[in-house]
Amino acid sequence: MKRGTNTPKPHIVLCAPKKTGKTTLIERIMQETKAGAPSIPIYGFQTKRFACADGIKRIYMFPAGLSQNDEGSPDARYLGSTCGRVRDVCTATFETYGTALIRSARPGGLIIMDEIGHMEKDARLFLQAIFDALDGDIPVLASVRYTDGSIDYLERIKNHPWVQLYMLTEENRDAVYAEIRNAIFSDRKEGRDHEPL
């Protein structure tokens, strides 16, 4: 779709170090999408780490907006594990499950991607689905891993021409939340729920 130079950027990406509140902010937004009238359909994915007794953290992917309290949930898919560093990666989960969760999005909805990091570096179909979403009109709210700029696809996401990038800190997260909330819900109140943000 051709966009004019004055068109607001339709997608929002959060970048911050761990424990800064990226996921908490995204979950607050999702809660409001469910409470709205009408509610906004949620698509995409979220990831969660589960700490094990052996010190290993196992990472699972879930459909965005669903409960992530149980790694044994039928909606959970194993992504890999870490123990100070990445131990293993299940690229097939990104390529099949993750790609399907992104491509299932329909107009009028919101695509959540929380979070995009370095484990998916070999998942070409998954990364293509991400960039296709960023090239599209269905609004995206994503978080990306904070890095030193050495991971090419993360830099491409942050610098995508239709992305509004927020570098989140403990000091600015309330202000950022207010801006994002306004961007997502202002068009809905004006009856433009099938347009980009």
Predicted regions and their residues:
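Phosphate-binding P-loop
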Residues: 2-9
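The conserved Walker
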Residues: 18
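Conserved lysine of the Walker
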Residues: 22
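N-terminal phosphate/diphosphate-binding loop that engages ATP/GTP or pyrophosphate donors
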Residues: 30-84
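Phosphate-binding/switch loop-helix module in NTP-utilizing enzymes
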Residues: 81-131
